Amino acid sequence: MTKLNRSLRTALAAAVVAIWPLAGQAWEPTRNIEFIIPAGTGGGADQMARAIQAIVAKHNLAKVAILPINKSGGAGAEGFLDVKGSPGEPHKIIITLSNLFTTPLATNTPFNWRDLTPVQMLALDNFVLWVQADAPYKTAKDYVAAAKAAGPGKFRMAGTGAKQEDQIITVAIEQATGAQFTYIPFKGGGAVAVQLVGGHVNSTVNNPIEAVAHWRGGKLKPLCVFELKRMPYTAKVTDKMSWADIPTCKESGLDIDYLMLRGIFMPAGVSQEHVDYYIGLFAKIFETPEWKDLMERGAFNQTRLKGKEYAAWVAKEEARHVSLMKAAGFIAK
């Protein structure tokens, strides 16, 4: 073998060794990740997305930054259409709430969850019936009785968006009890809670994380939670009560339950390798103390799903929302 051939073989071997690790590496983002929030600032989706951003940055869980972007227009349609219009783009994710189902049903906006790629269920979010702390009602039954006695439309219920989850629950209360509320929509749960604190409305069905600061501050009080069982968190939020002390609405004579998805989707057309990266990222996030604190602070139902199980759950939940929306008269014609 000539000296030239030996040199050539050595160079080729070195090139193979240099390239081989790259060929075996899993995909990672090469630029910042857009994190679309199809809701306003201050609400539950916004708070969770920004908590995820902070956790990833604090623990150096990604080599790029996560950039939360609120796109709440059209009851979240703006955000969903943005992701739908980015097929194959792995640097874009979206956090979902029930407007994943309600917005296309109520507005005929041309998108469906099947236009996206399911990645990870983060948790399920509770809804709580809230009133002002100094309101005379001790139970949900007391409150509903007062609303009925006041007459149709006299009591005002604030909620996020029109024909979305908060109004679905409001209509369910009306149908179950005969009470009639004036429903007033706002862009996000943070604004909804502020309206109740200010006395501009009589009640809300805010998610726990949207109202907990006002509860702890002595401005609001919870009457019941719209879940089949009590929340498991026993640490005191106020000097007298924990999340676990809040009765279910069914216990209080209001036989209604509703949980909301907090989940992650990507655009259609991404690869399994792209999906796996985010599943791995969220697995790391779930182990951080900040995430565990968020789960307790927001009294989340810590159900997590991914892959086929997640997609099957979403399909079943879509069918349930079709039924709920029909019952409420919210399906667009």
Where are the regions a protein language model picked out?
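Bacterial N-terminal signal peptides that target proteins for export
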Residues: 2-12
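Cleavable N-terminal signal peptides
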Residues: 13-14, 24
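N-terminal signal peptide c-region/cleavage motif recognized by signal peptidases
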Residues: 19-23
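N-terminal (or domain-start) structured segment
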Residues: 26-115, 154, 175-207, 214, ...
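Hinge/capping helix and adjacent helix->loop/strand transition within the periplasmic-binding protein
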Residues: 29, 58-59, 63, 82-92, ...
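An extracytoplasmic/periplasmic, membrane-proximal ligand-sensing/linker region
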Residues: 30-32, 179, 272-333
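Short, surface-exposed alpha-helical segments at coil->helix boundaries
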Residues: 46-50, 54, 167, 171, ...
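C-terminal lobe and pocket-closing loops
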Residues: 124, 138, 212-287, 316-319
